[in-house]
Amino acid sequence: IIWPMRNLGRLIVEMSTGLVSYQRVTKLIAEEREPLDEGDVQPAGAPQGHIRFDHVAFAYEPPPEVNSNEEAADAPVETLSDHRVFDGLAFDFEPGPEIDTHGDMAGAPDGAALAEPASPTPHVLRDISFECRPGQVIALMGGAGSGKTSLVNLLPRFYDATAGLITLDGQPLNSYTRRYLRQNIGIVEQEPFLFSRSIRDNITYGVGRVVPDEEVHAAARAAAIHDGILSFPEGYSTMVGEKGVTLSGGQKQRVAIARTLLKNPRILLLDDATSSVDSETEAEIHQALQGLMENRTTFVIAHRIQSVMDADLILVLKDGRVLQHGTHDELMAQPGFYRQIYDLQARMEDELQREIAGSNE
């Protein structure tokens, strides 16, 4: 009788989990689609890419009803890379004076408009201010829950800021239509999503026009995946399976880069695009990304300092605030969180090299 009772307990758990999932799916289906063409500004051409954050704060809207099971399902999942790099760094953060990375905020809204309004949920971003000029690279670093992804998700208007002001080329970001922003912003995620279609279909997905083979091949060459595709028996007609299961992690990343190149966006969001691949593949992807980032305003989320050393501005986030900011050389010249991360990663790299050398002897 013991085993039937245990199976009954497991069945109850599975049914409860399934019921919660069903409720959340039905809520999602019932949601109204956000208006894509709501906005006063829709320029004929691409944006220049001049982005400015002025005392920006953001908090997620709480769900209308949350029970204990849904709370558990909504708990944030922290990645291994977050723990590997940032855990164990003893650095107490005391909120100090306001950090302004672009000097005087001429034309900013009145102080009342910049104050964080009362919110039923805690703010995940607080008093974020910086400026990114066209073609510059902004790097974001910080541990799990520091607000890196939340910050970049404001740019395509997946969410709107709770307080403060974000401008694109001098116009408030929320005055642009979501369709215009998303047509001109390219995203390469840590785990790119590929559809169960051919490689060619995945590269051309979202372009919105008929794309000749020459353009597809040129994008694949720039992403360093063309030769790999031709090695498959069916070439660009190769079916990749759901989520690209037939491709390696590096191949999926390069297909996503080719897709973004074909879209030719003015603004790029790179969400830790090389954290889940080996060192050799990382070097190949990094080379492809350099071509993708050229003359484009780029935001890079990264955990490895080697990936952000050449950035025009590095923002170190902690608990939704800018803890440090500056170039790599400027941050290395001052004690702080960034220097601790650098020293830790350098020790890890030295230990790895010694292990490799020892195994080869």
Task: Name these PLM-found stretches.
Residues 1-28:
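Cytosolic ends of transmembrane helices, especially the final helix of ABC transmembrane type-1 domains
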Residues 31-32, 159:
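Two-component histidine kinase transmitter core
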